[in-house]
Amino acid sequence: MVKDEKELNIAILHPDLGIGGAERLIVDLALGLKSVGNNRITMYTSRHDPKRCFKETSNGELDVHVTGGYFPRHIFNRFMVICAIIRNLLAALYIIFFSGQKYDVIVLDQISASIPLFKLFTNSKVLFYCHFPDKLLTSRTSLIKRLYRIPIDLFEEFTTGCADQVLVNSNFTSSIYKQSFKHLKNSPSVLYPIINTNEFDKTKQSHNFSNQPIENNLINPIKLDDKKFFLSINRYERKKDLKLALDAFSVFISNSESGGSGKGKDEIYLVFAGGYDTGLKENVEHLQELKDKAKEYGLENRVIFLITINEEQKQWLLLNCCCLIYTPSFEHFGITPLEGMYAGKPVIAVNNGGPLETVVDGKTGYLCNPTVKDFANAFNKIINDPINSKKMGINGKQRVNDKFSFKPFAQNLNTIVKKL
């Protein structure tokens, strides 16, 4: 067991320190370990672009070393998993034999391949963060692919089981982990991801969205700063079920215009904002599908599509929407509901996966069956009871501060490391 008073020398190995949810978590994990005592943190990665990374990894706040990146990421666009494993092993060999350091703790995530090396050649305790079993993230559309994955899946289970402690991002992921790795007896511990509340606090509500340089991204140019709107933030992918929000919004508006009990729905908009890459066929196709559906419903003047917004724009939207809508089912965790809650907004989300652990039904928002009827009813509750909606927003921000902010994250992480 690691002693409380000891200053720890800790290495963190991550495949690609770019910009993404896994990268944000591993950076927060490094900052959390650094904030506890005087721990020395060194990050290793096979790829790090200073122009495309979180600033903490490029401004000197965290010590980052690139190693193993000389091996290709793929071979003629194939064997990506094998190449990732080899890059991981090469980075591990550098840490073990050439870094000149002896580490008390090694932290890895995403790729477990090198864990046996650290256990065999060092006295380090190994902590592995499993965002989600890799074996469940790959398609097996052909017999060759299925056969190819058999040894890789077995290797993943074996190497994951070599860690001294495994962490996952939610109880939902923990249950999937146990189903996927049936031969592993030790249960993982849950360490929830967090949001960067300090950065969020820097954005003021006084920012005028109409002055932001995104007017070309609007399906219909409109000033949002004086409008009431529901907000959905997700990538333009079909698995995110954005159509559910659009269908529910259509029913919500239709009920109002046919004499429903809703108030002022003629002034309400639905805003979709999310990642969009013209090089990704699905992004292009799905955005057009949603635009066509909005036109079919006669809502082209009430549904707004924004693409590839920056952090400041996203925070403005969160601070000024009336409610955040979260439609993906069986998400491993889902950070967006936390962002909505910290912005002081109620959240309408599906009643499965990660949101079951972040959103408290009736207190910080509404958890709904992923049906048009249930989501439309929740839309109606938000608009018809503004006092309760405001109260839920206040409750949500308090819940994030209590459970999903940096301080409890660092404290929980420190407790886990002490027990290694």
From Swiss-Prot:
Membrane topology: Single-pass membrane protein
Location in the cell: Endoplasmic reticulum membrane
Listed GO MF terms: alpha-1,3-mannosyltransferase activity; GDP-Man:Man1GlcNAc2-PP-Dol alpha-1,3-mannosyltransferase activity; GDP-Man:Man2GlcNAc2-PP-dolichol alpha-1,6-mannosyltransferase activity; glycolipid mannosyltransferase activity
A Gene Ontology BP annotation from the UniProt entry: dolichol-linked oligosaccharide biosynthetic process
CDD domains: GT4_ALG2-like
EC number annotated for this UniProt entry: 2.4.1.132, 2.4.1.257
Residue intervals passing through the bilayer: 79-99
Keywords: Endoplasmic reticulum, Glycosyltransferase, Membrane, Transferase, Transmembrane, Transmembrane helix
GO CC annotation, single: endomembrane system
Pathway membership: Protein modification; protein glycosylation
Family designation: Belongs to the glycosyltransferase group 1 family.
Protein's recorded name: Alpha-1,3/1,6-mannosyltransferase ALG2
Gene name tied to this protein: alg2
